[in-house]
Amino acid sequence: MKITGISGSPRKGQNCEKIIGAALEVAKERGFETDTVFISNEEVAPCKACGACRDQDFCVIDDDMDEIYEKMRAADGIIVAAPVYMGNYPAQLKALFDRSVLLRRKNFALKNKVGAALSVGGSRNGGQEKTIQSIHDWMHIHGMIVVGDNSHFGGITWNPAEEDTVGMQTVSETAKKLCDVLELIQKNRDK
């Protein structure tokens, strides 16, 4: 089974890349195949709401979304990490989420995939829960199965994430829960 991690930060090598890496390491240790999307490396233009994707299986905007669509389609689970920018995730991740409407219009391509969210803020109560709830909203819109970390919403860290031992534990627990649910689904399919 495959888990795709999406680092929603426009900043390279920072906290989101570190927490998505930690989460995917848990998945690898459990035997999952992993893949990543680093929004900092991708060119994703905002949706124009042109409606062209209603009638075709591609977006008319020529950027990196075609590769991202394929990574999301190929995944059994998707874990998204986002920093808090003004109380929510950054515009670059919003563009990716908006453009994912193509996958919804094409028979709910993300339906029943398992999703989880991670967030990092500048302080312990820096908007991470709101950011995670917004990511969960996107997942629910796609009909995904959403999991948390067994305590609240998902993996919540503060800057610098790798020094936040409590936060990094929530990242690990969120990844474990994602893996647990995927394994349960697989066991049910194998019956």
From Swiss-Prot:
Residues binding [4Fe-4S] cluster: 47, 50, 53, 59
Keywords: 4Fe-4S, Flavoprotein, FMN, Iron, Iron-sulfur, Metal-binding
Record has Zinc-finger as a keyword: no
Protein name: Iron-sulfur flavoprotein
A Pfam family hit: FMN_red
Cystine pairings recorded for this chain: none
Record-linked SUPFAM superfamilies: Flavoproteins
Outcome when changing residue 53 to S: Modified 4Fe-4S-cluster properties in electron paramagnetic resonance
MF (Gene Ontology): 4 iron, 4 sulfur cluster binding; metal ion binding; oxidoreductase activity
Cofactor(s) this protein cannot do without: FMN; [4Fe-4S] cluster
Cofactor note: Binds 1 FMN per subunit. Binds 1 [4Fe-4S] cluster per subunit.
Gene from which the chain derives: isf
PANTHER family: IRON-SULFUR FLAVOPROTEIN MJ1083, NAD(P)H-DEPENDENT FMN-CONTAINING OXIDOREDUCTASE YWQN-RELATED
Function: Redox-active protein probably involved in electron transport during fermentation of acetate to methane.
Quaternary assembly: Homodimer.
Keyword 4Fe-4S on entry: yes
Family to which this protein belongs: Belongs to the SsuE family. Isf subfamily.
Mutation effect (residue 59 to A): Formation of a 3Fe-4S cluster in place of the 4Fe-4S cluster
Other observations noted: The electrons derived from oxidation of the carbonyl group of acetate flow from ferredoxin to the 4Fe-4S cluster and then to the FMN cofactor.
Result of altering residue 179 to S: Unmodified 4Fe-4S-cluster properties in electron paramagnetic resonance
